[in-house]
C-alpha cells in the first residue's frame, strides 16, 4: 500500500484546533454535517446519471448507512454517492473551502453561537468530526473508477492518503474513532436518536445498522420535505431542514412553503433567516437556493433562480416543467426558469409587505440585516421598482424611527408634494446637518439614507407614486414655500436675490473658483451657510463615492447658500452696506466650515487653521 503524508494548508491547523476545542456548543451536530455531505454526494451522482447511466450501473438505489461499532469504538457513515478519487480527497479534505478559509478566520468573533454558523457556511463542516473523534478515516471510490483510496488524519497538522486493496463499492465511508470521553456517541439508542433528529428531511433513505439484530433499520421517511403537505410537517421539521440546508444555528424568521399550479408548476420551500448572513456582501458568496427538477438536484450555482437582491433567501425550488436532461448552460436563459423567478419574487415581496404591516418590530430587525441588499434591486432595470419601494423603510429625522414611503406621504404637510431625503454615513451626523434644519423646523420630515446603495437607487427612482424624491442638498429648496405654489415661490426668490445681491457678489469675489455660485438660502434657519447643488448636478455624497472609487478625478464646485438671518452673515452684510470689505478671512472660514460639515476636503488646511486661530485670538484678547 503506497502512502503519501501531506501537511494541511496553513489555516487548516487553526480550523482543526477550533474543532477539537468544540467550537460547536452542541457536539452532536457533527452528524448533521456528515449526513448532509453524504446526501449531497448522492444528489450529485443522481444528476450525473441522467446523462451517464453507466455511473450507477448495478446500484441505482441511493442510500446512507450509519453504524455504531462499540467493539472498535467507531461510528461509521457510509453512502453510495459520487465518491472521491485521490485528487478529490486532497482538494476537498486537505484544504478548507479554498477561497473561503481566510474569510472564515477573519469572521470569527469569539462568540460561539455566531461562530457556529460560520462552520458550515465556509465548508468546514466535515472537520467537526474531530470534536468527537481523535482519528478520522475516509475510504472512497469514485463513480466510474476502479481505484479505492483512503484518507486518514488525527487532526494534528497532517494527513495520509493511500491506495487500498479493499473490496469497496462506489461511494464514501467515514469512520470516526471516537474519543474515550465522548463514548456516549457509541450508545445505539443515542446514536439512533441523533441520526433521526438530523435526517427526517433528507430525501435519501438513511439506515441504521443494528449489530445485535444484524440488520438495517430505516430511520427517515426518505421523501423530500417540500413534497409533503404543510399539514404533515411540524415547525421543528421546518427548522431542522432550514438549519441543515443553510448550515445555520438560528431559526428562520419566515417560512414560505407553496405549490404553484397552472401554466407553470413548481414547489418552493424558502426561508428568510432571522440573523444576518456573513457573506451577504461578499463577492464570492454562494447561492443558497437549490434547484431541483422532479426531486432531482440540479444546481445551486450559476443559475438565475432568484434575483441577486433576494440572495438572503435559503431553500429549494422543485420544478415539474423543466426537462431532467437540461444542461446547466441552457438554464441561463430559460423561459420557464424566468417565470419561476418572477413568481417567487412576487411571492417574497408580498410576504415582506405583509410582515412590514403586521410585525413592524420584527421587520425593523429584518431590515437591519438585509435592507442594504434588498435596495440593490432598485438599481436593476428588470425590477418592479414601485413594488420594491413599498417594502423599503428608512429612518425618519422628524420621528426618529423607521418608516415606509407610504407612511412618509401620509405625513405630508398641506400642499407638500415632495419626499425629502439626506444621505450620509451616520444618522446622528445627518440629524445635526444644516441642510435639514429648516425643513424640520417646519415639521417637514426628511428621510436619512446611510447605505451606499441609496445614492445609486435615487438616481434611477426620481419619484414614488407621483411624488418627487429630492435631496435636501438641492439649491432650489425653500422651506417657507415647500407647501406653496411655485408662482409664489418665484416671486419671493427674486425679492431675496435682489435685496442681498451685494452680499452674494462679495462672497463670489472672495471665493472665486472655489464656488459655482452663491445664493441666499431658503432652507437654513440657524447655521450661517451650507453647500448645495443644482437640480441637474450629482448629489454631494454620490460624487464623493465616485471620487473614492476613482470613477471621477475631482470634485465639482458647489453652490454656497447663505443664511441672512444668521448673526455672522448679518454682520458681513451690514459691513458691506457701510462700505467695509474687510471680512475676506471670515468669508473663507465660513466656506471652509460648510465644506467640513458636508465631508468635503478643505482646500488649504494650513490657511484654515490660521484663520481659525486668528478669530479665536481676537475673541479672547
UniProtKB/Swiss-Prot annotation:
Upper taxonomic classification of the species? Bacteria, Pseudomonadati, Pseudomonadota, Alphaproteobacteria, Rickettsiales
NCBIfam families for this protein: PRK05218.1 (NF003555)
Name the job this protein performs.
Molecular chaperone. Has ATPase activity.
Q: Which SUPFAM superfamilies match?
A: ATPase domain of HSP90 chaperone/DNA topoisomerase II/histidine kinase, HSP90 C-terminal domain, Ribosomal protein S5 domain 2-like
Record text on subunit structure and interactions: Homodimer.
The cross-references to CDD domains, in alphabetical order and at most eight, read:
HATPase_Hsp90-like
Cellular component GO terms held in the UniProt record: cytoplasm
Primary location: cytoplasm
Region span, A: 1-328
Q: Where is this region: B?
A: 329-544
Q: Which residues cross the membrane?
A: none
List, alphabetically, the Gene3D superfamilies matched. Answer: 3.30.230.80, 3.40.50.11260, Heat shock protein 90, C-terminal domain, Histidine kinase-like ATPase, C-terminal domain
Q: Where is the composition biased (Basic and acidic residues)?
A: 486-498
Q: Which Pfam families match?
A: HATPase_c_3, HSP90
- Keyword match Chaperone: yes
Has keyword ATP-binding?
A: yes
Keyword annotations of the record: ATP-binding, Chaperone, Cytoplasm, Nucleotide-binding, Stress response
Q: Which HAMAP family match?
A: HSP90
Location of the region described as C in the Swiss-Prot/TrEMBL record: 545-621
UniProt-annotated stretches for the region Disordered: 479-498
Q: Name one GO molecular function term.
A: unfolded protein binding
User: What family does the database annotate?
Assistant: Belongs to the heat shock protein 90 family.
Write out the annotated subcellular location.
Cytoplasm
> What's the name of the protein?
Chaperone protein HtpG
Amino acid at each position: 500500500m503506497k502512502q503519501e503524508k501531506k501537511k494541511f494548508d496553513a489555516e487548516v491547523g487553526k480550523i482543526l484546533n477550533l474543532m477539537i476545542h468544540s467550537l460547536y456548543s452542541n457536539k452532536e451536530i457533527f452528524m448533521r454535517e456528515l449526513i448532509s455531505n453524504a446526501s449531497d454526494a448522492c444528489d450529485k451522482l443522481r444528476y450525473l446519471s441522467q446523462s451517464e447511466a453507466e455511473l450507477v450501473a448495478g446500484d441505482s438505489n441511493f442510500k446512507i448507512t450509519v453504524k455504531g461499532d462499540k467493539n472498535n469504538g467507531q461510528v461509521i457513515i457510509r453512502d453510495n454517492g459520487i465518491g472521491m478519487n485521490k485528487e478529490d480527497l486532497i482538494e476537498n479534505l486537505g484544504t478548507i473551502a479554498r477561497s473561503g478559509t481566510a474569510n472564515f478566520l477573519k469572521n470569527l468573533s469569539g462568540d460561539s453561537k455566531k461562530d457556529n454558523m460560520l462552520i458550515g457556511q465556509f465548508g468546514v463542516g466535515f472537520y467537526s468530526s474531530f470534536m468527537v473523534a481523535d482519528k478520522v478515516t475516509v475510504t472512497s471510490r469514485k463513480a466510474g473508477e476502479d481505484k479505492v483510496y483512503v484518507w486518514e488524519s488525527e487532526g494534528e497538522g497532517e494527513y495520509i492518503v493511500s491506495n487500498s486493496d479493499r473490496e469497496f463499492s462506489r461511494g464514501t465511508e467515514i469512520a470516526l474513532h471516537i474519543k474515550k470521553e465522548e463514548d456516549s456517541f457509541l450508545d445505539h439508542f443515542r446514536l439512533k436518536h441523533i441520526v433521526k433528529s438530523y435526517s427526517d428531511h433528507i430525501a435519501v433513505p438513511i439506515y441504521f445498522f443494528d449489530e445485535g439484530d444484524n440488520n438495517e433499520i430505516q430511520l427517515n421517511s426518505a421523501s423530500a420535505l417540500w413534497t409533503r403537505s404543510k399539514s404533515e410537517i411540524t415547525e421543528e421539521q421546518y427548522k431542522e431542514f432550514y438549519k441543515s440546508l443553510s448550515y445555520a444555528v438560528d431559526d428562520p424568521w419566515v417560512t414560505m412553503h407553496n405549490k404553484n399550479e397552472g401554466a407553470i408548476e413548481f414547489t418552493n420551500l424558502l426561508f428568510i433567516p432571522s440573523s444576518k448572513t456573513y457573506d451577504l456582501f461578499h463577492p464570492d458568496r454562494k447561492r443558497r437556493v437549490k434547484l431541483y427538477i422532479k426531486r432531482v438536484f440540479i444546481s445551486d450555482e450559476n443559475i438565475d433562480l432568484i434575483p441577486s437582491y433576494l440572495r438572503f433567501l435559503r431553500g429549494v425550488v422543485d420544478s415539474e416543467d423543466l426537462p431532467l436532461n437540461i444542461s446547466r448552460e441552457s438554464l441561463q436563459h430559460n423561459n420557464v426558469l424566468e417565470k419561476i423567478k418572477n413568481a417567487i419574487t412576487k411571492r417574497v415581496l408580498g410576504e415582506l409587505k405583509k410582515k412590514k404591516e403586521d410585525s413592524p418590530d420584527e421587520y425593523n430587525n429584518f431590515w437591519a440585516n438585509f435592507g442594504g441588499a434588498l435596495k440593490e434591486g432598485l438599481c436593476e432595470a428588470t425590477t418592479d421598482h414601485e413594488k420594491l419601494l413599498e417594502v423599503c423603510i428608512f429612518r425618519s429625522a422628524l420621528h426618529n424611527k423607521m418608516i415606509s414611503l407610504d407612511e412618509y406621504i401620509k405625513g405630508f404637510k398641506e400642499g407638500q408634494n415632495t419626499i425629502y431625503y439626506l444621505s450620509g454615513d451616520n444618522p446622528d451626523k445627518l440629524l445635526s446637518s444644516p441642510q435639514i434644519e429648516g425643513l424640520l423646523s417646519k415639521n417637514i420630515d426628511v428621510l436619512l439614507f446611510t447605505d451606499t446603495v441609496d445614492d445609486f437607487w435615487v438616481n434611477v427612482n426620481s419619484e414614488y407614486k407621483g411624488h418627487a424624491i429630492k435631496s435636501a442638498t438641492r439649491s432650489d429648496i425653500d422651506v417657507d414655500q415647500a407647501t406653496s405654489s411655485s408662482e409664489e415661490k418665484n416671486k419671493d426668490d427674486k425679492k431675496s436675490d435682489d435685496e442681498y445681491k451685494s452680499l452674494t457678489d462679495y462672497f463670489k469675489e472672495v471665493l472665486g473658483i472655489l464656488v459655482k455660485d452663491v445664493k441666499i438660502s431658503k432652507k437654513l434657519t440657524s447655521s450661517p451657510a451650507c453647500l448645495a447643488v443644482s437640480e441637474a448636478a450629482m448629489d454631494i455624497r454620490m460624487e464623493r463615492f465616485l471620487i473614492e472609487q476613482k470613477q471621477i478625478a475631482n470634485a465639482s464646485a458647489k453652490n454656497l447658500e447663505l443664511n441672512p438671518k444668521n448673526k455672522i452673515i448679518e454682520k458681513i452684510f451690514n459691513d458691506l452696506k457701510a462700505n467695509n470689505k474687510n471680512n475676506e478671512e471670515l468669508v473663507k472660514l465660513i466656506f471652509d466650515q460648510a465644506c467640513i460639515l458636508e465631508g468635503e476636503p478643505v482646500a488649504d488646511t494650513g490657511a484654515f487653521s490660521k484663520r481659525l486661530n486668528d478669530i479665536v485670538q481676537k475673541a479672547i484678547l
